[in-house]
Amino acid sequence: MVKKLGLNFKNTKTSVSELKQRIVFLIVAIIVFRIGSFIPIPGIDTTILSKILNNQNGTIVDMFNMFSGGALSRASIFALGIMPYISASIIIQLLTLVYPTLSEIKKEGESGRHRINQYTRYATLILALVQSIGIAMTLPNIAGIRSIIINTDFYFYLIAIISLVTSTMFLMWLGELITEYGIGNGISIIIFIGIIAGLPSAIGNTIEKTRQGDLHILLFLFILLLIFSVIFLVVFMERGQRKIVVHYAQRQQGRRIYETPSTHLPLKINMAGVIPAIFASSIVLFPATIISWCKVNHEWLTKILFYLQPNQFLYLILYISAIVFFCFFYTGLVFNPRETADNLKKSGAFISGIRPGEQTAKYINKIMLRLTLVGSLYITFICLIPEFMRSAMNVPFYFGGTSLLIVVVVIIDFITQIQTLIMSNQYESMLKKANLN
């Protein structure tokens, strides 16, 4: 009895200790990331650059600056953030559909996953190099102001490119360490921290505006109610699933026939996650950003720039269309109904009233199309709420729809990871107790 109590106490202590270690590691990693976001690239007058980039509201620069926790506006070594890694991951996923060799590697299990990760790292290095060269070459010519660069010689470009590339690779490595030794997905955590870095000052500014009477108290309360409602909707939709009941063939042992219990195939409503919102924002904002950087006095370019500004009708149409397109595109990329149907058939599973194989694939695909349509409408709604708040009601809204989605999804994943860690430790404890008996 005493031995059992001692083992139970030891297992509980080990579980709490492991959770503490992971949380401490996560906090240290976050501190390292935030410190790095304040280290400037050598040779840049960050004060002038910050003033210039503050005028880039509603452009792709503004979005990347938020994802990097303000590192871009400070010309920090972390200015590229983790975006090259995200782009590289999506490119590699696309290539697995085009090249059969990569598709076969992906199916090799743990070894295949390791090789795909290596290819993703190489692609990240290439993208980071290209983007860092672009930033280094663009910085001296932003808005035609050359005074932000103290000395525009060869060594400035070399140091800037090396600083940006190595910092991006460091962030990728830090994200992988967080995934392994911390809690949650490391890359998502880094993006999450970057987004919420400016949240305290935004809350303070909103409260100050309310206190001074610039923002009506009822409007302030409405904003709070809206935020909580949106968070509730995001949690509900992200946790929502369509469960398809799956049966297994009867198992015969000797003369007896055993009925195998049925299970279900869970299909998420929003299978694409936040990727469609990120890609849609990037693509729609990119042309306007490039035009605003180029000092070209063509009337037709000025008109294009005007119509591609946030809250303009053309911008909203393109934005909504891009979100819906990428929802269907990315869902088709990460989920293959035919492959799922083949796996069910191989394991002896079937859906009641549906023939295994081709008919099952068509049935699953039909359900996925409906779920993706609902998911795309949900993401579009979330992404348009901040636009409506800013334009129609002239309300300061710190989060964009993309950022709000990322924040809530990462928090959900973080809580799930903690619950999983606690449950796995409790399960191990139960197994040890059973072996002791």
Curated annotation (Swiss-Prot):
**Subcellular localization(s) per the UniProt record:** Cell membrane
**Organism lineage:** Bacteria, Pseudomonadati, Pseudomonadota, Gammaproteobacteria, Enterobacterales
Top-rank taxon: Bacteria
Q: Which GO terms describe its biological process?
A: intracellular protein transmembrane transport; protein targeting; protein transport by the Sec complex
Membrane topology per record: Multi-pass membrane protein
Q: Could you identify this protein by its name?
A: Protein translocase subunit SecY
Q: Which InterPro entries match?
A: SecY, SecY/SEC61-alpha, SecY_CS, SecY_dom_sf
Per UniProt, what is the name of the gene that codes for the protein in this document? secY
Question: What family, per the record?
Answer: Belongs to the SecY/SEC61-alpha family.
Query: Does the keyword Transit peptide feature in the UniProt annotation?
Result: no
- Bilayer-crossing residues are 23-43, 77-97, 125-145, 154-174, 183-203, 217-237, 271-291, 315-335, 367-387, 395-415
